[in-house]
């Protein structure tokens, strides 16, 4: 009978050492798999937190928009019927907060992109609004302070004040609007006439036509 003997230094032929190596490899594989599972769990938690953050941001922005819309509504009292005024007031009511929160992330991203693109336009519109406000104040200050005619009107059951319009003031407002429209038309007409004016010395309709002809001449030279 041949008896296999393994020397302590013969690591390549030792079955005990091979078994130990297999166990070590299995342990390392298990540790690696466990780490991968941990990383996947962390990634899932991060995605969930990002989604919750976007949803909370959506709810906050929609609530802010609803509050700003509610505060910016102006109530105008006129000679309109009560039914029309009530319909107008119903339109000015803020939307349901629950309805505002039920927006998808895609809609929120579109709204965010649209808001960023319109920031420059808002700043420009702010300047126009300031000019319009100053013009309106100037026109109001120019109105005659005539109180010789008694005001006609009354108070409705809802507490609204109704005042009849003064025919003279209405006529003056119409004349002012017509005069302003006429001035705008004349300014626009002068600009168009200047653009379409024919320069007899050069033989060009306008600067754009002159540049186009110069470009053609340079191409054929």
Curated annotation (Swiss-Prot):
GO terms for biological process: mRNA processing; RNA splicing. It is found in: Nucleus. Residues 72-98 are annotated as: Disordered. The keyword Transit peptide does not apply. Pfam families: SYF2 (PF08231). InterPro entries: mRNA_splic_SYF2 (IPR013260). The keyword Cell inner membrane does not apply. Involved in pre-mRNA splicing. Belongs to the SYF2 family. Associated with the spliceosome. This is Pre-mRNA-splicing factor SYF2. It comes from Kluyveromyces lactis (strain ATCC 8585 / CBS 2359 / DSM 70799 / NBRC 1267 / NRRL Y-1140 / WM37). The lineage of its organism: Eukaryota, Fungi, Dikarya, Ascomycota, Saccharomycotina.
